[in-house]
Amino acid sequence: MNVILLDKIANLGNLGDQVSVKAGYARNFLLPQGKAVVANAANTEVFEARRADLEAKLAADLAAATQRAEKISALESVVIASKAGDEGKLFGSIGNRDIADAVTAAGVELAKSEVRLPLGAIRTTGEFEVEVQVHTEVKAIVKLSVVAEA
């Protein structure tokens, strides 16, 4: 199924690209979320008329994401207290939701889906640098300090 993208989509294309995707992906994800329209003559004309508006919206989203990333990077070390054993091994783990909640409590809104932990959950005390993907093109680093509860 050929579609015209209305947004930048990772591993697929940019705004205005006409790409061929599987019908299920288009029907169940791209079309309902407003990220694409079916590629036909009428939709192509409508898209070309709206192209400037869509590009301006993308630029505004990118600028807002860049500002959020700067706020996140400007944060001092975010501290999370958790129960731990004598050797610094946590009883449980620190995951995406815990990190997102701690950063939000520190004053910058952050969703758990934006936190990237490629090595899995944090299971020890110490200092960590966690990558946060605010936008497809914008990433930030959060300094995280995991300490044992008294």
UniProtKB/Swiss-Prot annotation:
BP-aspect Gene Ontology terms: translation
GO MF annotation, one: rRNA binding
One GO cellular component, as annotated: ribosome
Keywords assigned by UniProt, alphabetized: Ribonucleoprotein, Ribosomal protein, RNA-binding, rRNA-binding
Source organism superkingdom: Bacteria
InterPro entries on file: Ribosomal_bL9 (IPR000244), Ribosomal_bL9/RNase_H1_N (IPR009027), Ribosomal_bL9_bac/chp (IPR020594), Ribosomal_bL9_C (IPR020069), Ribosomal_bL9_C_sf (IPR036791), Ribosomal_bL9_N (IPR020070), Ribosomal_bL9_N_sf (IPR036935)
Homology family: Belongs to the bacterial ribosomal protein bL9 family.
HAMAP family hit by this protein: Ribosomal_bL9
Function: Binds to the 23S rRNA.
PANTHER family assigned: 50S RIBOSOMAL PROTEIN L9
Name recorded for this polypeptide: Large ribosomal subunit protein bL9
